[in-house]
Amino acid sequence: MPDGKFIIKIDKQSSGEYIGKVAWLKMKYYGKGDKEEGVEQHDRNNKNSDLKSRKVLGLQVVGELYEKNGNLKGGYVYDSWNGKMYYGSAKMDNENTLLLRGSFDKKGIFGLTQKAKRVTDPSAYGLKD
């Protein structure tokens, strides 16, 4: 997903797994000029036709991450913009910045790292703590 266009809320489950769901979208509906203009964004690029109707808002896009040596490893990152799943890992760059990596290989050598900034005022986006 493009930078600054969404918020992913990451939570630790009772099992120890960290998951992330899309909690906010800058554009909840497809914009002007899009073939689905005015329609709520959904998982339209998913290869599985049964999943294409899932709404992006609330969609789990990070999962199966477990803490190991202060980092989160072993999971996945799903990109609803292209419908692809990547091996996932994450680590804190500093107190307010998470480095979330999606890679083609399990070791994380070939991929892309995206900086995620902590939301300090969730209410500004209509979110609760």
Predicted features along the sequence, with ranges:
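Edge beta-strand at a domain terminus
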Residues: 104-129
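A residue-level signal for beta-strand positions that form part of recognition/binding surfaces
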Residues: 17, 97, 113
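Central antiparallel beta-sheet cores of small beta-barrel/beta-sandwich binding domains
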Residues: 2-88, 117, 121
